[in-house]
């Protein structure tokens, strides 16, 4: 059987002040050239992501306010213009509407949700059925800080995250007013 191979392209993005963010990856121009080589080698998909070999998770997965929404998208757009394989983007794409706009604009082929899925693992189903989606705050409390401190992952907005096997939260019966 064939196996799809995705390459996560580590790019050193820029902070809002123009300084490099993280270490150990490719500059955007290098990433674009490397993406063409990857396609030529037969890769099936490329995910443009932040590079980080600093040991600081905040460099890779910035907390709210540290980076703009969709912050890896400019490099993903450049890569997509150069290759014919699908290109994914990741990085503070916090709503389904934002992801749909990126896809509609042709800026990327796939949205790689990360923290959003920890916050609401049913995001795709809810988007399809019109149910309200719990949107990630990008607070990094329970997810990124837990990884950094080698603890189990949780989410401040999703009480079940990390305890799915032991907690079964069920909807209450009838309408209730809760203060």
Model-found features: residue ranges?
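Flavin-dependent oxidoreductase catalytic cores
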Residues: 1-179
């Amino acid at each position: 059987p064939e196996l799809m191979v995705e390459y996560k392209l580590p790019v050193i993005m820029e902070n809002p002040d123009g300084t490099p963010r993280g270490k150990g990856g490719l500059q955007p121009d290098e990433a674009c050239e490397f993406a063409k080589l990857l396609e030529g080698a037969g890769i099936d998909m490329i995910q443009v992501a932040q590079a980080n070999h600093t040991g600081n998770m905040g460099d890779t997965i910035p907390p709210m306010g540290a980076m703009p929404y969709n912050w890896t998208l400019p490099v993903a757009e450049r890569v997509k213009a150069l290759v014919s394989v699908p290109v994914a983007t990741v990085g503070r794409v916090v709503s389904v509407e934002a992801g749909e706009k990126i896809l509609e604009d042709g800026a990327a082929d796939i949205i790689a949700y990360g923290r959003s899925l920890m916050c609401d693992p049913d995001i795709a189903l809810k988007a399809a059925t019109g149910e309200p989606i719990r949107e990630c705050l990008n607070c990094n409390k329970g997810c990124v800080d837990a990884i950094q401190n080698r603890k189990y992952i949780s989410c401040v907005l999703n009480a079940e995250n990390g305890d799915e096997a032991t907690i079964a939260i069920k909807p209450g019966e009838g309408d209730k007013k809760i203060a």
